[in-house]
Amino acid sequence: GASGSSRDVIFVSTTDATPGYHSHPLDAGTWQIMLGAYVVSPDGVDVKINLRFTPKTRRWFKGDLHTHTLASDGRLPLDHLARHAREHGLDFIAVTDHNQPVKRASFPKIPGLTIIPGLEWTHYKGHSNFLGIEHPYEGSFFTNTEEETQQKFREAHKNGALISINHPLESDFGFHFDLEKLPYNMIEVWNGPMRPRNIEAIGWWDQMLKAGKRQVAVCGSDYHEDTVFQRLANPTLNVLAWSPSEKDLLEAIESGHSYFTYSPTDLHVDLYVEDATYGVIKHWREGLQATLNAFALEACDQIRLIDQDGSRILFDAPQKGDWQSNLKVMKPGYIRLEIWRTFFPGLPSMPALVTNPIWFD
C-alpha cells in the first residue's frame, strides 16, 4: 500500500490493514519500506523507523456457519447479509447457498467480518455444508445412488472442503445416507432455534461420544430471513482461534475449539484442564482438575456436566451473575458442559449453551 505524507503510523496484518494498505500475511523475508521526502538538505536526512510485531494470541470469535442469500432461497443479497452479520456483532459467516458455489472475489469488504466460502449440498436424502473452498466438486451436485454420493463427498474432502452433516434428525430434511461410508468433519447438532429435534440431535451426538467416537459438533442458524422464529446467529458458533482469518477459523472449528449459544449473547463458559480446553485431547492422570468459569448467567440457569457416565447438575443460579468452580476429572473419557435456561414463563427449560468436549485418554 501507500499513503500521503500526513500519515506516520501504519499497520498490516493477515486480516486487516490501515486504509490505503492491503491485508497480507507477514511472510519471512526482506520487506521494502519506501519513504518519500519532498525537501532534502545537502547533508541528507535522518530517518528513524520503529517496527513493532504483535504475535497472534488465541481469542474468541462469534459467527454463523449456515446462511443463505438470494442465490438460493434466502431473502438478502450477499452484501446485505454481510452488513447484517456485522450489525449482529459477528466476526465471521459462511455463505452456504443450496448447491451454489460462491467465489471469494464476490465477497463485499466489511471491516471486522470474515466471509467463508461454502455451499449446502442439498439432496432429498440429506443436506451437508462443504466449507472453505470455492469448487468442492466437478459437475452437477446431484447423485442417484449411495455410491455417487460417496464419490461426491470424497471429491469434496480431497479438494479441501470442511464437511458438516446438517440437521441430521429433522423430520423433513434429515440425513439418510450411511454416515459410516462418508468422509465428514463435523455434525450440526443445533440448527436454528432450539427445539425438540435439536435436543434429540445433541443426545444422538452424545451417544457417539459415549461410544468412544471423538466427534466434533457445530451449530448454524440456517438463516434465510428475519422472522419471529428465525434470526441470524440463532444459534451462534463461538470459536477460540488464533486470528479471524479464514484459515485459522476453519482449523479451530475442525478441531472443536468451540461452543454454541442461542444468540451472540454475553453468556460464556471457560472450561480448562490445565492448558487444555474444548476440542483438545489430554492425557488423563489421577488428581486432574478442571476449572470452570461461567459468565452472564441468568437467574435459574442450570449448568450441567456431561461425561461418559451421564449428566449431572453442577449449579442452579439463584440470580444473575458469574460462577466459578473446580472439578475433579475422575477417569478417561470426556467432559463437556451445557447451560439450560427457561426463556419464557411456563415453558420447559432448553439448552442456551452447549460446548464441545475435552477428551482424555
For the regions a protein language model found, what residue spans apply to each?
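Edge beta-strands of jelly-roll/beta-sandwich modules across compartments, strongly enriched
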Residues: 40-52
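Short beta-strand-plus-loop segments that form exposed binding edges in beta-rich domains
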Residues: 33-41, 340-344
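Ligand-binding face of N-terminal immunoglobulin V-set domains in extracellular IgSF glycoproteins
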Residues: 13, 17-21, 27-36
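Short tyrosine-centred short linear motifs in exposed loops/low-complexity segments
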Residues: 26-31, 41-42, 331-333
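C-terminal functional module detector
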Residues: 53-54, 223-361
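Surface-exposed beta-strand/loop patches in noncatalytic accessory domains
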Residues: 1-18, 311-313
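A metal-dependent hydrolase metal-coordination microenvironment
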Residues: 55-182, 188-205, 211, 220-227, ...
